[in-house]
């Protein structure tokens, strides 16, 4: 969860003191007191699809994962509720120096300072109430760094599934494409339809260096309140 990235208490206070935005979708029926902000899946993150539990794997396979990975992707991450359950990147892409990992692992590795420097600098907790909430309770998400001059010719993809009724999903995607580099990143989100309110309040921050190119595509199929 949102550890090691600034003053969580301060962001929570900002959330408590701000009014609900008067723009965007209707949030009638959403009672934040009833939203569970963290739901841990019944597995740790795996690097092999065969090791993902069958019930979770079945959900993603109906949506074309990992078939898409085998055919046309440089790497795939799959998040189930609040944490990633699968993450893998092609060896030839990793050998180019491309970093594609989950946010928690990025915070523990050699790119931790880079994550801290860029986290919630484009989307600030003071932007609106749900940005502050995201900063306080975020979990999961992807970190991507493409070094100078590196061109990733096939896309990377992260997929987020919110499956628990009454839950919120607060993944954070942070992509840094350095000078002269090139990347296409695809992100997908989905959730089943429930008769209770769910909340999706993820955050995406994209940093593109001089003469670099980033194409970011998002595909969503959400039957819930999306901020």
What does each model-identified segment do?
Residues 3-225:
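Glycine-rich and polybasic anion-binding loops at the starts of cofactor/ligand-binding domains
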């Amino acid at each position: 969860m949102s550890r090691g990235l600034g003053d969580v208490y301060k962001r929570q206070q900002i959330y408590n003191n701000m009014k609900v935005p008067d723009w965007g979708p209707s949030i009638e029926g959403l009672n934040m007191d009833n939203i569970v902000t963290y739901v841990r899946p019944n597995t740790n993150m795996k690097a092999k699809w065969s090791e993902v539990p069958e019930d979770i794997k079945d959900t993603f396979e109906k949506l074309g994962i990992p078939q898409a990975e085998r055919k046309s992707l440089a790497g795939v991450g799959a998040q189930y509720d609040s944490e990633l359950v699968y993450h893998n990147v092609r060896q030839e892409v990793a050998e180019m120096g491309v970093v594609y990992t989950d946010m928690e692992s990025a915070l523990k590795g050699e790119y931790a300072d880079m994550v801290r420097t860029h986290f919630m600098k484009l989307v600030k907790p003071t932007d609106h109430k749900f940005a502050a909430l995201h900063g306080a309770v975020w979990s999961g998400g992807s970190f991507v760094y493409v070094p100078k001059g590196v061109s990733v010719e096939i896309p990377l993809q992260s997929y987020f599934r919110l499956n628990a009724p009454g839950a919120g999903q607060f993944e954070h995607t942070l992509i840094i494409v350095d000078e002269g580099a090139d990347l296409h990143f695809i992100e997908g989100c989905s959730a089943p339809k429930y008769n209770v309110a769910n909340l999706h309040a993820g955050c995406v921050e994209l940093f593109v260096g001089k003469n670099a190119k980033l194409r970011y595509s998002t595909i969503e199929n959400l039957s819930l309140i999306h901020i």
